[in-house]
């Protein structure tokens, strides 16, 4: 890969690294500052902090896997990170929205992968709610993954589709 092509991609990768570092730092803070099961209210009726250990996948699903489940999710996350990187390096320079989405996805995947490989679980601590509805506890990596996925979905529906020419009539 030539120097110019790598230089502009480095900015996106640097952004991903920055988000990854914010995720890891925020989780380290949560471990030190929050007690398991204790809730700290930041914005009454909207935002709380509550330490949780997620041994499953999104929203705490599939937590019964034990050691097999831990390493299965590590391998799955590693495969997802590799897939995002391949897609990232195949995306044209002009496609900023997709490149940004890949950066967000990569940061989030690697943030949760690091926890799972190192600890056997993912540290979650952000709890949003409105009235009686509570969103499942999440972290910066989860928010990054959701933002990246939404950006990709937006791009999918906003990108112009190539027009297939209609068959010519031969009558």
Language-model features, listed with the residues they occupy:
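Alpha-helical transmembrane bundles and membrane-interface segments of multipass inner-membrane proteins
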Residues: 1-171
